[in-house]
């Protein structure tokens, strides 16, 4: 479905274009952006649309939203979107099946992907993790939540075969746990906070607790990136500026997050919204280039994260052979931003 911020972006673009000549209006180039609603890493898309930053770089965004990463990446086959954000697990799957590129990192969501237990069972599982053996865990397959859960199981000396895994969407997991039909669930924020606040569930292990790096990915269709590299660079510059602004104006950022989450059907406390900021590091332009740097032909930090994710997916039977990180992760477009004085200055603005 079309994202709720599409109308905002269109309206802002119209106003900005309308202030100049008709020729200026014609210079706005459509770019199709995909994301998942009411998620921390998607907030910059909303903020940038509200602030009119896409139009400042000559872009007119058209947004589409998806409930999870797998249907999102599948939609790329029909070219329904050009660029976007998603989890690192679907980004890797998208590289194999749909020739998608990972062009940057949205955030470190290692803490935000976790295994939760219902209020009545959590303490028992925490005291004796081995008791999870034989239990049923509901989670969204081929997701960052799935990766975090299996990393937690490994931390406790358990394997996927030691539990029964049932795959379902995040809304279904919340419903199942809230109604007492499931005791253990793999969720990602802000759904984790919804379960804690509305149903008294407890987070018993996160990807971070298990030592698993769980990044979010900025992605692009390879064919689009080849045809429109400058638009991809502009997309990145807008996204990076939005994070700069969000981190520098947290009170206003929290207010905008509240509205954005509510549009996606999520209502959480201000304390939980603040926790999103404190537990999920983001990267500015310099930070992105640092973690994606392949100095002397070696692997980057991001390569290492995705190599482990690929191994997890291969072990799951998602594909027979994991893709080499260097084949689908590229800093080419971030370097374009860095090399362009205008884009670099834009990306680094916090106002």
Regions found by a protein language model. Give the residues of each.
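Positively charged n-region of N-terminal signal peptides that target proteins for export
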Residues: 1-4
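C-terminal segment of classical bacterial N-terminal signal peptides
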Residues: 8, 13-23
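Short linear loop/turn motifs
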Residues: 62, 271-283, 324-338
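Soluble non-cytosolic domains of exported or imported proteins
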Residues: 66-70, 85, 139, 143-144, ...
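Pocket-lining segment of extracytoplasmic ligand-binding domains
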Residues: 121, 172-270
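Secondary-structure end/capping motifs
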Residues: 227-320
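Conserved C-terminal helix/tail region of periplasmic/extracytoplasmic solute-binding proteins
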Residues: 303-351
